[in-house]
């Protein structure tokens, strides 16, 4: 019974640190001039951590928190997660067209914010989701 309690507490702490990383990412994006449209937006296909807009660009953000600096291969979503994220962003974007004013051109972008235990941010911009039209730069 003691082990289950320890595992529960460890998981709960990881969840709280992840939420804190999302909140700090939100503040960072606001300071950069992004308008936050949604936070932890749920869809039938999964959840997107942050959805922001600046000008004609809509930014979808996945926030990762790790205690240690991870390799990029550990940060990038797995193929199954990429498919889920792509379907979720497509679902959200199709609904955003009804909420946002029409524009001649909308640019979609997907970024990953990777936070480590010491508060270091590594931002991956324009991350490609395989089997999609988005590309890693």
Where are the regions a protein language model picked out?
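Protein kinase-like catalytic core scaffold
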Residues: 46, 57-59, 109-111
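Short, solvent-exposed loop/turn elements at beta->coil junctions and helix N-caps
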Residues: 39-42, 111
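Conserved catalytic cores of phosphodiester-cleaving nucleases, focusing on short active-site segments
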Residues: 29, 50-69, 85
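Short acidic/glycine-enriched loop/turn segments that link adjacent beta-strands
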Residues: 43-46, 118
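Catalytic cores of nucleic-acid endonucleases
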Residues: 7, 65-118
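Acidic-basic catalytic patches of nuclease active cores, encompassing PD-(D/E)XK
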Residues: 1-39
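Short, low-complexity, polybasic intrinsically disordered segments
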Residues: 113-137
